């Protein structure tokens, strides 16, 4: 496939382009500027200027104005934060921050962690796509390692989702609501969501429902797509918030989500391993239930000023069925496959804060305890039917089904942290220390032990201490710089420790690794922030070194006893990721100018090759106009992405998506006092392009490439009624 001329965006060019496209700014501090408050960095509310890290905040209003309906839309204008894709069938796997993704990024909804991602082969993929864009109040993204507060699962960062409280909908009254209907041309999808807030600040209820139905995404490179994908997702949200007689607050929440997707993957037929396949269809079901109870307590002057205790339970249940008809094979067969994945998470969390002040200094002390259990069960089944004789067998490629890829496993994580924020004069010093203990306990699983008699079950007990130290210096009332060091930690996952696979037909075998070590990271962030009357700017330079990075299914060589080619999860010596993040905004009368930029480079120090999880440089620029009465607005967004060339191709040549510039136009129009009409035109120039995260690992001649291109010019529209 020929490569189009790409954009050449160096880090300096990225930032320079943004500066040149914005009008000059006079740096004048404004003490009255409303400061942005975030929770994710310290688990309590703080001004973003009191945090020694880079945090991105996305609000419900912003997502509505951008007509976001999926997790792919949520982060499309946040350089350095990407969705991880799994082809036309499975959709979004997870979220990537600064080149680190998968289960190394903690995703929490109302403080509750979401289930893990796990995949094996081409027909089994338990994704983490459980975030419903229709029921988000705001999203906070903490860039970089965050193990000092969040433990083993946050070595790559944190994505914290908050659903609406009743007060977010009720306002000053006793009831309120929000109804939103959105249609998108690119996948012919409809999303309807309704949020209702009842009560007041002392006793309130949020009730929300969201329903989304859509089809395959149109591809600009394959206008007559062979693939089809029909999806349906429904989500229910209930949240009760009540104050007791002591002035403390109780919260109880329930989220239920279920999704069903039918896919026809005809684009893969007739080539490679599917050269004899005449039909390939998927039937996938997903369900997630989350229960959360929290108690916010305390009063100034007591032994603690404030605190929150939380208990939660979450279960994810995924079932994926595949029909693989091989009508052109020497012996035509119809193969039915089943993949099932279930994970239960239950946990307790306690966070306490105390303020201490003297004439010259102020301390904010934090103390936290975490307890979390996960139980994970997975299996695959298969049945091959001779299309001529009707004869059936459960042996496929030498594998005898049903089977597990790892035993039923339980993990226990216990963590405790202490944090002190010391302020004196223009200086703030933040020191934190967390201790973690991790236990992996595989069960004596009869199915697993029968399938893999060569495997020895691996039990693990790991512990680590994660320090963090940050310094903030306020140069002026509106300007500050910060420097932070943070240590990250990730215990060996259950799947990597005990992964097993045995395919006699191809003569290879994957075996457990009892010697896996915990991953660790040491990250440094140097940042600058400025906040003016109607303008702001941020710049962050980061460098993170990862040691003992776990790579799944590393080739070991031939086993002299069995003659099989062996694979095993292994620790890499060292990898490094470093880069720059920047953002800015300027308001001049009716016009606004904003932008953000990202550049990163990742290197595997074992072979000095690039990391393929680190995407290309990117810059996002925006120009907006609002009428004097603020009832009408226009926004033009441009996304400039460089060609993706810094990659490891030692295992074979990879497809190189060209650089591209994409322009989107949005209109917001108020109709009356309670209704808002929004419309969007996407990819105005009808550009054919690929997102890097959609085509990772694919060769230049992969037949599925045309079907993974983004949509050409498309439209979307929404109608929003609130009261």
Where are these regions (language model features)?
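Short acidic/polar hinge/loop motifs at secondary-structure boundaries
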Residues: 114-143
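Flexible loop and strand-edge segments within Gram-negative outer membrane beta-barrel domains
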Residues: 229, 247-304, 316-343
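Surface-exposed extracellular loop regions of Gram-negative outer-membrane beta-barrel proteins
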Residues: 258-262, 266-273, 317, 439-450, ...
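Transmembrane beta-barrel wall of Gram-negative outer-membrane proteins
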Residues: 183-213, 223-264, 283-298, 359, ...
């Amino acid at each position: 496939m020929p490569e189009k001329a790409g954009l050449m965006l160096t880090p300096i060019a990225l930032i320079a382009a943004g500066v040149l496209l914005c009008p000059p700014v006079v740096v004048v501090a404004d003490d009255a500027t409303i400061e942005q408050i975030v929770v994710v960095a310290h688990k309590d509310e703080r001004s973003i200027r009191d945090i020694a890290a880079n945090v991105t905040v996305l609000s419900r209003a912003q997502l509505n104005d951008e007509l976001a309906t999926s997790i792919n839309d949520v982060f499309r204008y946040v350089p350095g934060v990407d969705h991880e894709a799994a082809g036309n069938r499975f959709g979004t796997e997870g979220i990537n921050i600064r080149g680190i993704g998968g289960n190394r990024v903690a995703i929490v909804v109302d403080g509750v962690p979401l289930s893990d991602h796990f995949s094996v082969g081409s027909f089994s993929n338990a994704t983490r796509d459980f975030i419903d864009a229709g029921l988000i109040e705001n999203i906070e993204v903490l860039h970089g390692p965050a193990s000092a507060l969040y433990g083993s699962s946050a070595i790559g960062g944190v994505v914290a989702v908050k659903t609406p409280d009743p007060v977010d909908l009720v306002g000053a009254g006793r009831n309120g609501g929000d109804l939103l209907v959105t249609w998108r041309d690119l996948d012919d999808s409809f999303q309807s969501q309704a949020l209702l807030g009842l009560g007041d600040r002392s006793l309130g209820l949020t009730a929300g429902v969201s329903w989304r139905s859509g089809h395959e995404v149109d591809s600009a490179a394959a206008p007559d797509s062979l693939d089809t994908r029909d999806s349906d997702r429904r989500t229910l949200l209930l949240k009760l918030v009540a104050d007791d007689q002591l002035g403390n607050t109780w919260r109880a929440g329930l989220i239920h989500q279920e999704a069903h997707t039918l896919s026809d993957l005809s684009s893969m037929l007739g080539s490679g391993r599917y050269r004899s396949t005449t039909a390939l269809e998927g039937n996938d079901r997903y369900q997630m239930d989350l229960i959360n109870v929290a108690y916010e307590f305390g009063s100034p002057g007591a032994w603690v000023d404030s605190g929150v205790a939380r208990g939660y339970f979450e279960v994810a249940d995924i079932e994926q069925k595949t029909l693989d008809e091989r009508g052109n094979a020497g012996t035509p067969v119809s193969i039915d496959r089943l993949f099932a994945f279930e994970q239960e998470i239950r946990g307790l969390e306690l966070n306490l804060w105390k303020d201490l002040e003297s004439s010259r200094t102020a301390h904010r002390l934090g103390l936290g305890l975490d307890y979390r259990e996960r139980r994970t069960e997975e299996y695959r089944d298969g049945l091959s039917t001779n299309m001529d004789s009707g004869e059936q067998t459960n042996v496929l490629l030498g594998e005898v089904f049903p089977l597990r890829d790892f035993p039923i496993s339980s993990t226990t994580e216990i963590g405790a942290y202490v944090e002190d924020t010391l302020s004196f004069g223009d200086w703030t010093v933040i020191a934190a220390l967390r201790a973690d203990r991790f236990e992996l306990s595989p069960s004596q699983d009869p199915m697993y032990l029968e399938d893999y008699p060569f495997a020895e079950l691996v039990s693990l007990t790991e512990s680590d201490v994660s320090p963090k130290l940050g310094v903030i210096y306020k140069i002026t009332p509106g300007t500050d710089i910060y420097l932070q060091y943070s240590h990250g930690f990730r215990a060996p996952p259950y799947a990597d420790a005990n992964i097993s696979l045995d395919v006699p037909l191809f003569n290879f075998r994957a075996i457990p690794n009892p010697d896996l070590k915990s991953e660790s990271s040491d990250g440094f962030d140097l940042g600058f922030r400025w906040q003016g009357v109607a303008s702001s700017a941020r710049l962050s330079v980061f460098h993170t070194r990862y040691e003992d990075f776990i790579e799944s299914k590393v080739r070991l060589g031939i086993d002299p006893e069995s003659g099989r080619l062996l694979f095993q999860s292994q620790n890499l010596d060292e990898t490094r990721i470093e880069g720059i993040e920047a953002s800015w905004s300027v308001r001049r009368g009716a016009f606004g100018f904003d932008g953000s930029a990202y550049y990163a480079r990742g290197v595997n120090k074992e072979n000095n090759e690039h990391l393929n999880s680190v995407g290309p440089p990117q810059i996002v620029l925006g120009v907006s106009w609002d009428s004097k009465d603020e009832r009408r607005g226009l926004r033009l967004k441009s996304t400039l992405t460089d060609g993706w060339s810094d990659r490891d191709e030692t295992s074979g040549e990879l497809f190189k998506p060209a650089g591209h510039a994409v322009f989107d136009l949005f209109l917001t129009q108020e109709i009356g006092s309670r209704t808002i009409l929004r419309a969007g035109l996407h990819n105005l120039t009808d550009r054919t392009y690929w997102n890097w995260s959609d085509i990772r690992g694919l060769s230049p001649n992969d037949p599925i490439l045309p079907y993974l291109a983004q949509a050409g010019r498309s439209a979307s529209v929404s109608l929003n009624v609130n009261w």
